[in-house]
């Protein structure tokens, strides 16, 4: 789910989650 969509530009399973967070 996009629980990290507030601070990230990707899904929680996408690499963007680690980079964007």
From Swiss-Prot:
Top-rank taxon: Eukaryota
Protein name stated in the entry: Apolipophorin 2
Keywords: Lipid transport, Lipid-binding, Secreted, Transport
Keyword Cytoplasm: no
Record GO biological process: lipid transport
Tissues and organs where the protein is expressed, per its UniProt entry: Expressed in hemolymph.
Function of the protein: Constitutes the major component of lipophorin, which mediates transport for various types of lipids in hemolymph. Acts by forming lipoprotein particles that bind lipoproteins and lipids.
Source species of the chain: Galleria mellonella (Greater wax moth)
Manganese listed as a keyword: no
Any one GO cellular component localisation term in the record: extracellular space
A GO MF label: lipid binding
Membrane spanning residue stretches: none
Compartment(s): Secreted
Origin organism lineage: Eukaryota, Metazoa, Ecdysozoa, Arthropoda, Hexapoda
């Amino acid at each position: 789910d996009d629980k990290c969509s507030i601070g990230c530009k990707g899904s929680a399973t996408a690499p963007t989650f680690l980079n964007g967070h």
